[in-house]
C-alpha cells in the first residue's frame, strides 16, 4: 500500500528521509575530502 500523497504525515516522513539522505551525503563528502588525502599521505 502506497501512502496517500496528500497525507501530511507521509509528506513529512518523506521530507525527513530526504533530509537524512542529504546529511549522509554531506558527511560522506566531508569524510572523503579530509580522510582520503590523509590516508594517501600516511601510506605514501
Curated annotation (Swiss-Prot):
Transmembrane segments: 17-37
Topology with respect to the bilayer: Single-pass type II membrane protein
Membrane side Intravirion: residue ranges: 1-16
GO CC entries: host cell plasma membrane; membrane; virion membrane
Main location: virion
Virion surface side stretches: 38-44
Keyword annotations of the record: Host cell membrane, Host membrane, Membrane, Signal-anchor, Transmembrane, Transmembrane helix, Virion
Protein's cellular compartments: Virion membrane; Host cell membrane
Function of the molecule: Inhibits TNF-alpha signaling and seems to block apoptosis in host infected cells.
Family that this chain belongs to: Belongs to the rubulavirus small hydrophobic protein family.
Protein name: Small hydrophobic protein
Encoding gene (name): SH
